[in-house]
């Protein structure tokens, strides 16, 4: 995997990689056999230097965790979408937007867009997303883990999208958009009761800290009980393209 953070930069041109310009941060992956992927990590403008046909996979930003006096909610992961067989014209600018993760006490994630596709950010916590967030009630009297791969989370409102959140919707693809965990705190670290985060970037707990969703996964942030507790932010989204397959 090759990362670039320069602006602008001409990437590709070796092996199976196409030549292109991109104004943001990205990573290129050579899958072998003439196959390739480009992961867009920050927003920017993509310009292919030759005509190409691509598939695109998009993940919206995850929601932040939310804390209440007697309960905690993990943020849901961002929604995902896959678009196939998109024709791109050489020397044409294509805008790519990477959705921000939600912040504060349960803030919603932002949408990711590009290449005719849009993936919505997760709704405000507790709310719908790619995979639902965890739920924790007073002293662990209710402990429900977060969802992953499109599954529902712990509360009735923390629902998943009901379809896979794997890359390009394929069974071998990496997981994205996991729901965030939830922690109830009473009496210091020894008093923490925790509902697990979902696979695919959901934020967990470390000591007394509610962790954010992982960057560029659309994972939900961890929620921690208490109206003044610092909540885990949602993970930013991502846009990935590959040669059409």
Regions found by a protein language model. Name each.
Residues 2-245:
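Low-complexity, glycine/proline-biased repetitive segments and flexible coils/loops
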């Amino acid at each position: 995997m090759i990362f670039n953070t320069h602006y602008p930069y001409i990437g590709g041109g070796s092996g199976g990689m196409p030549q292109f310009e991109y104004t943001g941060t990205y990573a290129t992956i050579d899958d072998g056999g003439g196959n390739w992927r480009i992961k867009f990590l920050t927003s920017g403008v993509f310009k292919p230097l030759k005509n190409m046909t691509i598939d695109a996979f998009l993940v919206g930003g995850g929601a932040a965790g939310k804390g209440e006096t007697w309960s905690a909610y993990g943020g849901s992961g961002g929604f995902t979408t896959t678009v196939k067989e998109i024709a791109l014209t050489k020397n044409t600018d294509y805008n790519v937007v990477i959705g921000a993760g939600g912040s504060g006490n349960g803030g919603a994630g932002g949408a990711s867009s590009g290449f005719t596709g849009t993936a919505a950010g997760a709704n405000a916590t507790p709310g719908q997303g790619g995979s639902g967030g965890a739920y924790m009630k007073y002293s662990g009297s209710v402990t429900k883990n977060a969802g992953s791969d499109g599954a529902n989370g712990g509360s009735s409102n923390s629902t998943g999208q009901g379809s896979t959140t794997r890359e390009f919707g394929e069974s071998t693809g990496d997981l994205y958009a996991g729901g965030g965990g939830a922690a109830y705190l009473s009496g210091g670290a020894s008093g923490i009761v925790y509902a697990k985060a979902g696979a695919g970037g959901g934020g967990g707990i470390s000591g007394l800290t509610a962790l954010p969703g992982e960057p560029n996964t659309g994972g939900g942030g961890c929620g921690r009980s208490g109206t003044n507790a610092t909540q885990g932010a949602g993970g930013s989204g991502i846009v990935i393209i590959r040669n059409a397959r």
